[in-house]
Amino acid sequence: MALTAEQKKEILNSYGLHETDTGSPEAQIALLTKRISDLTEHLKVHKHDHHSRRGLLLLVGRRRRLIKYISQIDVQRYRSLIERLGLRR
């Protein structure tokens, strides 16, 4: 269920600004998106897992705040990130 180190490294290499980038909004949003999709799949099977559902809502809120931040900083970076991740806005 949790992301492995290899999965994190792969996501950070494709969405980070440089090789060791872990703190840029793009990298954080990409990692959160992967965690959200994994939790969504878990909740499809375990419908009554309300603790995980609350965690999912917290992750979605954190990602939404980061997306809002990047849209205010640079609209072009925001649009390319949304398109690459396949998110709707």
UniProtKB/Swiss-Prot annotation:
Xref: Pfam families: Ribosomal_S15 (PF00312)
Record-level GO BP terms: translation
GO CC terms: cytosolic small ribosomal subunit
Gene Ontology MF terms in the entry: rRNA binding; structural constituent of ribosome
InterPro entries: Ribosomal_uS15, Ribosomal_uS15_bac-type, uS15_NS1_RNA-bd_sf
Keyword Signal carried by entry: no
Keywords: Ribonucleoprotein, Ribosomal protein, RNA-binding, rRNA-binding
Function: One of the primary rRNA binding proteins, it binds directly to 16S rRNA where it helps nucleate assembly of the platform of the 30S subunit by binding and bridging several RNA helices of the 16S rRNA.
Family label: Belongs to the universal ribosomal protein uS15 family.
Assembly and interaction partners: Part of the 30S ribosomal subunit. Forms a bridge to the 50S subunit in the 70S ribosome, contacting the 23S rRNA.
Matching HAMAP family: Ribosomal_uS15_B
NCBIfam families for the chain: S15_bact
The name this protein goes by in its record: Small ribosomal subunit protein uS15
Species of provenance: Mycobacterium marinum (strain ATCC BAA-535 / M)
